[in-house]
Amino acid sequence: MSLVPEHGNVYVLNQTNQLKGLFTIIRDKTKPRSEFIFYANRIIRLIVEEGLNHLPVSSAKVTTAQNAEYEGVMFDGRICGVSIMRAGESMEQGLRECCRSVRIGKILIQRDEETHKPVLHYIKLPEDISKRYVLLLDPMLATGGSAICAMEILINMGCKQEQIIFLNVIASPEGLKNVHDRFPNIRIVTAVIDEGLDNNGYIVPGLGDFGDIYFGTKA
């Protein structure tokens, strides 16, 4: 995991051969959907695990089966996930595999294909979300419009920037800059930063529409 100074609170997974191999598979348009899902889930799990590393902890002692004391840590506070629908829902299982019985809220924000502006359609969040650490889920960070819209909603509901950790699979430099300029204290954990955006606002080299491929609605 490395911090990206030029983008503020941005943390990128170590670019190991394993991670590069996983991305080679999910970026390959000739691969079947089943392989995309399997290997995308592996990347998502890595991102979630790293996101959890950014939660506050306090020291804790337990007694082992050998009647020996072990000094460890326990997480402070409660968490919840918030997926930016629909693609963000692909990351929910990875979060549930790491955090049993975690509460997950949903925000539906769709991008206008002509203006590329985000439009809010649906929201359902835990009533006590302002008292929780929020893992915001969306696999692709392109322009950052949808992410910023979701973050504004969370802030308006009483969440502090420091409580929000944004998890995504692929980010663009433009999206990272836009999010950081608007919310400099929100941490972002991503698996990789791609080259940039094309004229249509899509990430390149990217992998296409993550949600369409994952949920089987690719044309």
Curated annotation (Swiss-Prot):
One term under GO cellular component: cytosol
Binding-site positions, uracil? 203, 208-210
Instruction: Look up the EC number in the record and give it.
Output: 2.4.2.9
Is Transferase given among the entry's keywords?
yes
Provide the reaction this enzyme catalyses. UMP + diphosphate = 5-phospho-alpha-D-ribose 1-diphosphate + uracil
Q: Which InterPro entries match?
A: PRibTrfase_dom, PRTase-like
The cofactor binding remark recorded in the entry reads: Binds 1 Mg(2+) ion per subunit. The magnesium is bound as Mg-PRPP.
- Give the keywords, sorted: Allosteric enzyme, Glycosyltransferase, GTP-binding, Nucleotide-binding, Transferase
One GO biological-process annotation of the entry reads: UMP salvage
The record lists the membrane-crossing segments as: none
Q: Which Pfam families match?
A: UPRTase
What superkingdom heads the lineage? Eukaryota
What cofactor requirement does the entry state? Mg(2+)
**Activity control summary:** Allosterically activated by GTP.
Molecular function GO labels: GTP binding; uracil phosphoribosyltransferase activity
The record lists D-ribose 5-phosphate as bound by: 202
Q: Binding residues for GTP, per the UniProt record?
A: 33, 42, 76-79, 103, 132
Q: Which residues bind 5-phospho-alpha-D-ribose 1-diphosphate?
A: 86, 111, 138-146, 209
Task of the protein: Catalyzes the conversion of uracil and 5-phospho-alpha-D-ribose 1-diphosphate (PRPP) to UMP and diphosphate.
Q: Family membership, please give it.
A: Belongs to the UPRTase family.
Name of the protein in its database record: Uracil phosphoribosyltransferase 1
Protein species of origin: Schizosaccharomyces pombe (strain 972 / ATCC 24843) (Fission yeast)
